[in-house]
Regions:
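N-terminal export/assembly segments and adjacent metallocofactor-ligating motifs
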Residues: 1-264, 268-313, 324-325, 445-457, ...
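Extended redox/cofactor-interaction regions of prokaryotic respiratory oxidoreductases
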Residues: 137-216, 221, 245, 310-316, ...
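A glycine-rich phosphate-binding loop feature that marks nucleotide/adenosyl-phosphate handling sites
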Residues: 129, 268-273, 361-362, 378-379, ...
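Active-site rim elements
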Residues: 345, 390-396, 592-600
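Acidic/polar loop patches that form or flank catalytic/metal-binding clefts of enzymes
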Residues: 151, 259-265, 353-356, 385, ...
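Glycine-rich phosphate/diphosphate-binding loops that line cofactor/substrate pockets in enzymes
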Residues: 82-84, 103-123, 176-186, 334-336, ...
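Short beta-alpha connecting loops at secondary-structure transitions
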Residues: 230-238, 561-574, 586-596
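Long, C-terminal catalytic modules of enzymes
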Residues: 582-615
Length: 615
């Protein structure tokens, strides 16, 4: 296939050229499948590809505008070298054109010196969004192969940190999505699902429309009447940053006023029956150290995986192993009881009656105890979802706020069941012939779920891997400071901040070189002046389609290929481009449509060449 594609591209300037080439978009991380119309060697139109399950034939306005990226008059066509040693926004870098050999020789020399001294002094950053999306995954592998832990995400500190960590800890997945095929009541906090932005945006927009036609009620909690809210059954304006208060008030109504919860689910699939002692910690079996529950069947404490455990208590006070204790569910109800709708109303500006009504509708729509038969298997049916994303966790205490949303679904049993919130995708059974790739959640400490694959890690117990079990903080040896963060997920802005206080963080080396693969980190990582100071301290190699604010601080700029000019075997990950639930899960190969201009080259083959040169 690749050879056939190259022949088509190589013959692009042929007379009477008029072809449609299937490929994959890269204007955002969704990577929708597209068809590209090339006529007489020129791309004239981009459409969605109806033959692919990735995007379901849809394409957004940004995707259609990819032609402007391809033919931008500011595209770089040759490597550039800085001649002005002063780096600042007001300084002309004094760019001069150089050959690829000179560029790669210079970079190789720097890398060999770092490799001999301390590989950790090399850093790399890329993004899952936009033209460099596939390069993000490769950059992580490249840095790991070189021996450096300092690969970081350039999307900034608000890119999914709370949602991804909750998805990993609660679903064994990287992300969560609603099961739109069977959901009947959806509450949206700060998300653009179906309206203007989200995972698998174009596919989920269609699925949202189908669900609305089917009768799903949509309630949007958002300060702004956005593209989702304008299509909702109900838009509830809320004071920015107060979503967590409303979630807790809804939880209070469901647990303490209505008394509606899925006891069977909570007992079988959560740690909420674990007994909690006066110190706030699990009561543990002194023999094996395992947390215990109270079995109502024979009125005694048993560890969580005791095969004789049959009816864990959710409420009550007990004495176990010499300690007076209560199930975690009791503490959850007590914690929620402090958040009355009236109190939450003062904080959120949402009327108390509205909070109480939405909570009641949500609990009722959950149909606790109902089942559905799918493909011959009877499964729990909980057709309610709470959807949240960047708008909800772009504030302080985002992890706790999102935990509140997640708990709403947990208490009614609407997690990883038809109609509820699904992890994407916690289990992969692998290719039937080879068994690869293959992953599934595993039982972590204390019996709690830990993802089989998450954020690029696939082996249980890897220190920088999954969000659960949490890591013990240790003095940092990486610029990401993940050593200090128990459940952190690649916070992109922290290397910039850590570089300002290397002595304070006691990091035992100072980075000397940085690869910037695509993103404009001067803007994406926060304070431009702080990021500029970060860039001034290193030799910077930037792979770019055009010059931007970040290249003011680059030493060498390499002209990259646009997504319509390159071959990518796996454009992005399934959590980004496939809806959750049933469906045809697949990857769509990105195929080149035209050649790169001038001497522009796709950065991944360039980095592979650098790897060969460095050895």
């Amino acid at each position: 296939m690749a050879q056939a594609v190259r022949e088509v591209v190589n013959n692009e300037a042929a007379a009477e050229d008029d072809v449609w080439i299937p490929s994959a978009c890269a204007v955002c991380f969704n990577q929708c499948s597209i068809k590209v119309h090339r006529k007489n060697g020129v791309v004239v139109k981009i459409e969605g590809n109806p033959e692919s399950s990735v995007g379901m034939g849809r394409i957004c306005a940004k995707g259609m505008s990819g032609i402007t990226m391809l033919y931008d008059p500011n595209r770089l066509t040759t490597p550039l070298k800085r001649t002005n040693p002063k780096k600042d926004f007001n300084e002309d870098p004094g760019w001069v054109e150089i050959t690829w050999d000179e560029a790669l020789d210079t970079i190789t020399e720097k890398m060999k010196k770092i490799q001999a001294d301390d590989p950790r002094k090399l850093m790399g950053t890329a993004t899952t969004a936009g033209n460099s999306s596939f390069s993000f995954w490769f950059t992580n592998l490249f840095m790991s192969g070189f021996g450096s832990p300092n690969a970081f995400h350039s999307n900034g500190h608000q890119c999914g940190n709370a949602e991804h960590v909750l998805a990993g800890a609660m679903h064994g997945a990287t992300t969560t999505m609603p099961d739109l095929e069977f959901c009947e009541y959806m509450v949206v906090f700060g998300s653009g699902i179906g309206g203007h932005a989200y995972y698998a945006f174009t596919s989920n927009a269609q699925k949202m429309a189908d669900a609305r036609i089917r009768g799903m009620k949509l309630v949007v909690i958002d300060p702004v009447l956005n593209g989702v809210a304008e299509k909702a059954d109900e838009w509830v304006p809320i004071r920015p940053g107060t979503d967590g208060a409303m979630a807790m008030a809804m939880l209070n109504v469901i647990l303490n006023e209505l008394g509606q919860y899925d006891a069977e689910y909570l007992k079988a699939h959560t740690n909420i029956p674990y007994l909690i002692g006066p110190d706030g910690y699990y009561v543990r079996d002194p023999d094996g150290g395992k947390p215990v529950m109270w079995d109502l069947a024979d009125q005694r404490a048993k560890h969580y995986d005791d095969p004789s455990l049959s009816d864990p208590a959710l409420e009550g006070t007990y004495t176990a192993h010499g300690k007076e204790c209560r199930p975690g569910f009791v503490l959850l109800k007590e914690q929620a009881s402090a958040w009355t709708p009236e109190k939450a109303s003062e904080i959120t500006s949402v009327p108390a009656d509205t909070i109480r009504r939405i909570a009641t509708e949500f609990a009722t729509a959950a149909r606790i105890g109902s089942t559905i038969v799918l493909e011959g298997t009877e499964l729990p049916h909980r057709p309610v979802s709470v959807v949240y994303f960047k708008g909800a966790h772009a504030h302080n205490h985002a992890w706790l706020t999102c935990f509140g949303f997640e708990t709403l679904c947990e208490v009614v049993g609407a997690c990883d069941v038809p109609g509820g919130v699904l992890g994407t995708n916690p289990v992969c059974e692998g290719h039937p012939d080879t068994g690869m790739p293959r992953w599934a959640p595993w039982a972590g400490p204390d019996g709690l779920l830990s993802p089989g694959v998450w954020n690029g890690q696939s082996e249980p117990g890897l220190r920088t891997g999954t969000p659960y079990p949490p890591r013990d903080p240790v003095p940092p040896e990486t610029l990401t400071l993940l050593d200090l963060l128990s459940t952190g997920f690649n916070p992109g802005h922290l290397p910039v901040l850590a570089m300002q206080d290397m002595e304070g963080f006691k990091i035992p080396y100072k980075p000397e070189m940085l690869f910037v693969i695509g993103p404009n980190i001067v803007y994406s990582l926060g304070n431009p002046e702080v990021t500029a100071n970060f860039l001034k301290q290193m030799f910077v190699v930037a792979s770019k389609l055009w010059l931007d604010e970040t290249t003011y601080f680059a030493d060498i700029v390499l002209p990259d290929a646009c997504y319509l000019e390159r071959l990518d075997p796996i454009p992005n990950t399934i959590p980004h481009h496939h809806p959750a639930g049933r469906g045809n899960f697949s990857y769509a190969i990105r195929q080149p449509v035209v050649k790169p201009p001038g001497q522009a080259r796709y950065i991944i083959p360039v980095m592979l060449e650098l790897a060969d040169r460095v050895g």
